[in-house]
Amino acid sequence: MKVTVLSVGRLRPPWTDDVAHYEKLLGRHCRLEIVELRDGARLGARIPERAFVSVLDEGGTAYDSVGFSRFIEQRRMSGIDLCFVVGGAYGGVEVEADHRLSLGPMTLPHQLARVVLLEQLYRAHSILAGEPYHHG
């Protein structure tokens, strides 16, 4: 399964180390591509063809970690790649989406949202693989 994370804005320290950490861990479970774009105007053009598109949105569907792992497993079983879209500092992502994902009711800085998304992707894959990372 290929997972693409499209993000508006450039990642800056200290978040770069965290993203690199989860990028390395996720490499054992999926093919991960992280794409940073200067502005949201180009997002639509960078979405992979036939990918299931999930936009981060505070009004989207919220999952617990096990529920999110089930969401990932359903996508994996369908044979369709996943594309997550993370807006910039001012949000406002305007792309056609199959799904809207909430990381919780609080507003997060876009750089932190990217780290949280990658951590939850790793946690979901660890749950599916039966690895001891998740203690829930």
What is the predicted role of each segment?
Residues 5, 54, 87, 117:
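Conserved RecA-like P-loop NTPase ATPase core
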Residues 22, 70-73, 99-100:
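Glycine-rich, phosphate-binding/catalytic loops in enzymes
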Residues 1-26:
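N-terminal beta1-alpha1 ligand-phosphate binding loop
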Residues 90, 94-135:
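Structured adenosyl-cofactor binding patch, chiefly the S-adenosyl-L-methionine
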Residues 27-83:
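S-adenosyl-L-methionine/SAH cofactor-binding core of RNA-modifying enzymes
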Residues 11, 58-61, 88-91:
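Short glycine-rich anion-binding loops that position phosphate/pyrophosphate groups of nucleotides
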Residues 15-17, 64-66, 93-96, 112:
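Short glycine-/acidic-enriched loop or helix-start segments at secondary-structure transitions
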Residues 6, 35, 54, 99-101:
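Hydrophobic/aromatic beta-strand patches that form the interior of the parallel beta-sheet core
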